[in-house]
Protein backbone atom coordinates (compact mmCIF):
# COMPACT_ATOMS: atom_id res chain seq x y z
CA UNK A 1 0.00 0.00 0.00
CA UNK A 2 1.08 3.53 -0.80
CA UNK A 3 -0.03 6.62 1.12
CA UNK A 4 -0.42 9.85 -0.84
CA UNK A 5 -0.21 13.00 1.28
CA UNK A 6 -1.00 16.54 0.17
CA UNK A 7 -1.33 19.72 2.22
CA UNK A 8 -4.04 21.82 0.58
CA UNK A 9 -4.05 25.56 1.27
CA UNK A 10 -7.40 26.87 0.07
CA UNK A 11 -7.88 30.53 -0.82
CA UNK A 12 -9.39 32.41 2.14
CA UNK A 13 -13.17 32.59 2.06
CA UNK A 14 -13.55 29.66 -0.34
CA UNK A 15 -13.56 26.67 2.01
CA UNK A 16 -17.33 26.07 1.85
CA UNK A 17 -17.32 26.05 -1.96
CA UNK A 18 -14.14 23.92 -1.94
CA UNK A 19 -15.76 21.31 0.30
CA UNK A 20 -18.80 21.17 -1.99
CA UNK A 21 -16.56 20.68 -5.03
CA UNK A 22 -14.57 18.03 -3.16
CA UNK A 23 -17.78 16.09 -2.44
CA UNK A 24 -18.14 15.66 -6.21
CA UNK A 25 -14.42 15.12 -6.86
CA UNK A 26 -14.08 12.29 -4.33
CA UNK A 27 -16.47 10.18 -6.40
CA UNK A 28 -14.10 10.46 -9.37
CA UNK A 29 -11.03 9.26 -7.50
CA UNK A 30 -12.87 6.50 -5.63
CA UNK A 31 -13.84 4.85 -8.93
CA UNK A 32 -10.20 4.51 -10.05
CA UNK A 33 -8.41 1.14 -10.18
CA UNK A 34 -6.06 0.79 -7.22
CA UNK A 35 -7.88 3.32 -5.04
CA UNK A 36 -8.31 2.11 -1.45
CA UNK A 37 -9.20 4.95 0.93
CA UNK A 38 -9.43 8.74 1.16
CA UNK A 39 -9.53 11.21 4.04
CA UNK A 40 -9.80 14.98 3.82
CA UNK A 41 -9.21 16.67 7.18
CA UNK A 42 -9.44 20.37 8.00
CA UNK A 43 -6.67 21.92 10.08
CA UNK A 44 -7.64 23.11 13.57
CA UNK A 45 -5.00 25.85 13.66
CA UNK A 46 -5.54 27.17 10.12
CA UNK A 47 -9.12 26.87 8.86
CA UNK A 48 -8.03 27.38 5.23
CA UNK A 49 -5.71 24.33 5.30
CA UNK A 50 -6.58 20.68 4.72
CA UNK A 51 -4.62 17.46 4.61
CA UNK A 52 -5.57 14.95 1.94
CA UNK A 53 -4.61 11.33 2.58
CA UNK A 54 -5.23 8.76 -0.14
CA UNK A 55 -4.27 5.10 0.04
CA UNK A 56 -3.43 3.37 -3.25
CA UNK A 57 -2.51 -0.23 -3.98
CA UNK A 58 0.52 0.88 -6.04
CA UNK A 59 2.26 4.19 -6.74
CA UNK A 60 1.46 3.83 -10.46
CA UNK A 61 -2.27 3.65 -9.67
CA UNK A 62 -2.00 7.32 -8.73
CA UNK A 63 0.85 8.68 -10.85
CA UNK A 64 -0.08 6.95 -14.11
CA UNK A 65 -3.61 5.61 -13.72
CA UNK A 66 -5.44 8.48 -12.05
CA UNK A 67 -3.29 11.34 -13.32
CA UNK A 68 -3.50 10.02 -16.87
CA UNK A 69 -7.28 9.67 -16.84
CA UNK A 70 -10.27 11.73 -17.93
CA UNK A 71 -11.40 11.59 -14.29
CA UNK A 72 -8.25 13.50 -13.29
CA UNK A 73 -9.03 16.22 -15.85
CA UNK A 74 -12.42 16.68 -14.20
CA UNK A 75 -10.75 16.59 -10.72
CA UNK A 76 -8.48 19.43 -11.87
CA UNK A 77 -11.44 21.45 -13.17
CA UNK A 78 -13.26 21.05 -9.86
CA UNK A 79 -10.42 21.64 -7.40
CA UNK A 80 -7.21 23.21 -8.69
CA UNK A 81 -8.59 26.76 -8.77
CA UNK A 82 -8.92 26.74 -4.96
CA UNK A 83 -5.24 26.21 -4.12
CA UNK A 84 -2.78 28.94 -3.18
CA UNK A 85 -0.04 27.89 -3.29
CA UNK A 86 -0.42 24.77 -5.39
CA UNK A 87 0.12 21.72 -3.15
CA UNK A 88 3.10 19.43 -3.10
CA UNK A 89 2.04 15.78 -3.27
CA UNK A 90 4.23 13.11 -1.69
CA UNK A 91 3.95 9.33 -1.54
CA UNK A 92 4.89 7.16 1.43
CA UNK A 93 5.72 3.47 1.75
CA UNK A 94 4.27 1.06 4.32
CA UNK A 95 4.66 2.14 7.96
CA UNK A 96 8.08 1.76 9.54
CA UNK A 97 6.38 1.74 12.96
CA UNK A 98 2.74 1.52 13.94
CA UNK A 99 0.88 1.57 17.26
CA UNK A 100 -2.75 1.76 18.27
CA UNK A 101 -4.99 1.08 21.22
CA UNK A 102 -6.79 -2.28 21.20
CA UNK A 103 -10.49 -2.40 20.44
Kindly give the residue locations of the regions a language model identified.
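Residue-level signal for secondary-structure boundary sites
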Residues: 16, 60-62, 97-99
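Short, functionally important structural connectors and interaction interfaces within domains
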Residues: 2, 24-27
Amino acid sequence: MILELAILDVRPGETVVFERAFAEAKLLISAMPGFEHLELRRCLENSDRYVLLVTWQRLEDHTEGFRGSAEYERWRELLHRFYDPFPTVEHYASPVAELGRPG
